[in-house]
Amino acid sequence: MAAKDVKFGNDARSKMLRGVNVLADAVKVTLGPKGRNVVLDKSFGSPMITKDGVSVAREVELEDKFENMGAQMLKEVASKANDAAGDGTTTATVLAQSIVNEGLKAVAAGMNPMDLKRGIDKAVIGAVAELKKLSVPCSDSKSIAQVGTISANADKTVGTLIAEAMEKVGKEGVITVEEGSGLQDELDVVEGMQFDRGYLSPYFVNKPEARSVELDNPFILLSDKKISNIREMLPILESVAKAGKPLLIIAEDVEGEALATLVVNNMRGIVKVAAVKAPGFGDRRKAMLQDIAILTSGTVISEEMGLDLEKSTLEDMGQAKRVVITKDTTTIIDGTGNKSMISSRVSQINQERDEATSDYDKEKLQERVAKLAGGVAVIKVGAATEVEMKEKKARVEDALHATRAAVEEGVVAGGGVALIRVANRIVNLRGENEDQNVGIRVARRAMEAPLRQIVANAGEEPSVIANKVKAGEGNTGYNAATEVYGNMIDMGILDPTKVTRSALQYAASIAGLMITTECMITDLPKEEKPDLSGAGAGMGGMGGMM
């Protein structure tokens, strides 16, 4: 086992503090509308330019192992805030830095670290409760656009695009961000339910110019088995032909004689028909077929349920206003499903998603919700160069997370104002002893840090502006972009409550652990021994001396 280096007390804490400050100083220059960029060197390709706090934090590794331990613990703050709300990483880092610095000063002055931590925790619980009281719902497009704009670094086009996407696909819809091919940002919206399965034969195509199949008011047959025998299909084909409507078959597979007969019937105009494979695999396929059944008010013909394809009737068929099938995708538009059944199915999938443990499962369940409840929107980010593209895509993703958080828990005044107000509201909070009271004061002081940093990055004097904002009331704050005081919500400077809450909670949690550190242990660096393997090589010419 390798030898260890052990440090105690102030010696350990001062090293840890140095690491915390190096990382926080690198991250906090990005905060606010006038925050600067950070350039990150990459082992291959061009450097990455970013204003995203967590991207900067992830790059920091320090040579001194004790300092690095401090930096890595602070990195956890940014990472946790990012996982919880998708934004607020820089705010969380600034809060944690302030709590650690002020807390360690108090420890050096003889305060009890455990009581300090209890005081900090008490202050945060009080502050979170007050934050929730200040929060206002964020439901209209205007406030969603404002949140998106602030998070995307005051880029109004991004905020507007996100608001437009949310309006079209709903709060449950899936919005993804991709790299575009042009200079302009674009929004593509797929309405209805779309899945990644195309037509099984090009002979089904009835729109040759678009190489697609379009079926108006079709019946939809859903089966979880392979269909290869046309005899099973004959009764339903005859019923559909009599009804004079087209038919879409979604099954595990349609092959051989069955597929050939369908193609011939379609080409002769006896019955307008198309067939596609069911989406997904295994249990997920069964679940998605059930989703389509509920969306179209149909029944999945499944032998597990005791249903037989030969005995199926038009009552078992689903229906939709329109279906469009391309080589790769099938889109069902305006299914005739019962709204209350769809919403209870959405609730059921949401519950499954909350209980799911893997991110992949959560993502797939969220996609199913989106396909049932709204649709899918794709924001295509445009930029002139690859470096700009990466930076902009990261900003758009941040803005998207922030708007989702805003819709979930509402918004509070931005620009660090909400934290100043809640710090003021817990001014009368008291702990069980004086050391806990100091902890409460440390947390309240830290709540001013984001505003002070935003002001410092804008080149103004933090103390003067912080005191003016503290003297104000409600949503009155300082707009660092325009350098004016006013109502932050009226000026469109909003922060999602969830982002502010997560930043405060994670900062206090990890900073509290750092304050209570008394000993740090790390591996001693291994000494490189000189390579002596070639030392005797020069003696070869002495062989004749004997």
UniProtKB/Swiss-Prot annotation:
Keyword annotations for this protein? ATP-binding, Chaperone, Cytoplasm, Isomerase, Nucleotide-binding
An individual GO BP term: protein refolding
| Gene field | groEL
EC number(s): the record gives 5.6.1.7
Q: What is its main location?
A: cytoplasm
Binding positions for ATP? 30-33, 51, 87-91, 415, 479-481, 495
Record-linked HAMAP family: CH60
Specify the protein name.
Chaperonin GroEL
Catalyses which reaction(s): ATP + H2O + a folded polypeptide = ADP + phosphate + an unfolded polypeptide
Q: Tell me which family the UniProt entry assigns to this protein.
A: Belongs to the chaperonin (HSP60) family.
Q: What segments bear the compositional bias annotation Gly residues?
A: 535-546
Q: Which domain of life is it from?
A: Bacteria
Assigned GO CC terms: cytoplasm
> Where does this one sit in the cell?
Cytoplasm
Q: Which InterPro entries match?
A: Chaperonin_Cpn60_CS (IPR018370), Cpn60/GroEL (IPR001844), Cpn60/GroEL/TCP-1 (IPR002423), GroEL-like_apical_dom_sf (IPR027409), GROEL-like_equatorial_sf (IPR027413), TCP-1-like_intermed_sf (IPR027410)
Q: What does this protein do?
A: Together with its co-chaperonin GroES, plays an essential role in assisting protein folding. The GroEL-GroES system forms a nano-cage that allows encapsulation of the non-native substrate proteins and provides a physical environment optimized to promote and accelerate protein folding.
Query: Which residues does the annotated region (Disordered) include?
Result: 526-546
What is known about its subunit structure?
A: Forms a cylinder of 14 subunits composed of two heptameric rings stacked back-to-back. Interacts with the co-chaperonin GroES.
Q: Where are the transmembrane segments?
A: none
Q: Name one Pfam family in it.
A: Cpn60_TCP1
Q: Which NCBIfam families match?
A: GroEL, PRK00013.1, PRK12849.1, PRK12850.1, PRK12851.1
SS bonds (residue pairs): none
